[in-house]
Amino acid sequence: VITAISGPYEPRDDRQCNRTGFYIRKFLDTTPSAGTIGRGSEMWSPYFRLAEAYLIAAEASFELKGSTTESLGYINAIRERAGVQPLTALTFENIVHENQVEFAFEGHRWWDLKRWRLADKIWNGDSNNPSAQRRGLWPYLVVDKGDANHGKWVFFEKNMTEIYPYPLKFELRHYYGEFENGWLNNNPKLVKNPYQ
């Protein structure tokens, strides 16, 4: 949703828009004036969705039995709802991809990559690895009557190295949480996690 001053969802004044003009449309109430100060919205924020239950079931079935019609059925139910072609075979990479696109902007990615032990491979600190680089989508409105894009919003992807010069680096020690000393003192069977 573009909310810039000249965007299609123009705010009432320039104090009510963000710097880029972008908001994530997912779970956003687009009713006019829904976000106005002093008014509320009836849009609920989901904590757990049916798609999450399907993806958990697909992953568990795949881990227990390998690629089965059961796990494929769960994935294809989500793909059908989204209007995407069904898969004929299932790999672990398909499950990773489905989680990434289904839960985009919902805060699942970090935890998924930790659970699958993939975070250190994807965010490996290599400046040549696109997955380890921060990128941004930059919009601008073309105002040139001689241009074919006149009056249209154009977007380009920009590498954010001038703002965030270092690539994302997830180290093995980041997989482990820390036990509080009180827990360790109260239970002699608990041992500290590595890197703690």
Enumerate the language-model features and the residues they cover.
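Charged alpha-helical initiation segments
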Residues: 19-32, 70-73, 80-83, 100
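Extended, hydrophobic/aromatic-rich amphipathic alpha-helical segments that build helical scaffolds
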Residues: 44-78, 93-102
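Long, intrinsically disordered, low-complexity segments
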Residues: 37-40, 45-47, 79, 87-196
